[in-house]
Amino acid sequence: MSNVLNMNNYPIPRLDREVKLRENLLRFCRLEPGQVWFDRQNGHRVGCLDASSVPDVITLCRNDRASLAIHDLPYNFIAFEQKRIDEFISWCRKVVNNSSEVLADSSSLYLWIGADQKNGFAPLPELMLMMRETGFVSRSFITLRNQRGYGTQRNWMSVRQELLYYIKGRPKFNPQYTDIPKAVKGYYKNVNGRLTENSARGRGETIRAGNVWIDIQQVFYRLEENVNGCYAQKPLKAIERIIDASSSAGDIVLDFFSHSGTTLLAAEMKGRRCLTMDIDPIFCEITIRRLEHFRQTGQMGWQNSNPFAVELGANGNK
């Protein structure tokens, strides 16, 4: 696996659970709530802001309008019972409405969301119903298959991540192709009086990506792109696929829940401008450091080291 490297072994635990570590890391964060970091090189912005706040969204986006938004909604609040489902959906409505105000008339919106099989698959169905009341039109329900899952011997293993795709207006869509070769042949069809086999009718030598993604590696500690401490990191390849499909070079991409900074990094690699925010100063700092780290080293993450290894040292408690 080409993106598996041997790096320094300085892991840190999940940052949402370690109160003392968080207090220590806040000393190294350059942003405080309400502040925005501006990238002088390519025009990216990172804000320590609240996605449900209209003034905060305006602070980040100003008069810019994006062609694409990719939000990894913090559905773990439901799993940890920090919010009731109805409160969470009401909050999501604010986030979606705020996104709509800073998206172009023709644009795309992607929402990562969970489905708790122990709780009626909440909050997925509730979010779907809420989205019917917005100005967005549903386009696809995508499943990203994890290589590892969880469950018991009395149920099917849970190995999926859910991604909802919506649009407003008539945005561009560029079909994407996987690295999977076409293996199944023999489906013939008469096209303009000529009998053709299915592989001859296709536009690529490999399989076109559908709404079930089985070809993307789940992030784990041996991958270069891994960012220790970030418990909800999405694969860089998944975000790159979305950006390639639903935007063009030079477009603006939004992400209101930056977390590990994957959307910002993908935008940098794909020649887009990213306007992103996180309410947590630590994840804002990680996002900025990940971009800087990539520009300095060409590496997409820290594998089993961490963004604060210099400050914390090998034992993680300087």
Task: Name every feature range the model reports, one short phrase each.
Residues 51-54, 305-313:
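Conserved SAM/SAH-binding loop
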Residues 177-181, 298-309:
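Short, flexible loop/turn segments with low-complexity composition
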Residues 287-288:
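Conserved SAM-binding loop
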Residues 315-318:
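C-terminal catalytic and target-recognition region of SAM-dependent MTase-like enzymes
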Residues 1-17, 23-277, 281-284:
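Core catalytic lobe of class I
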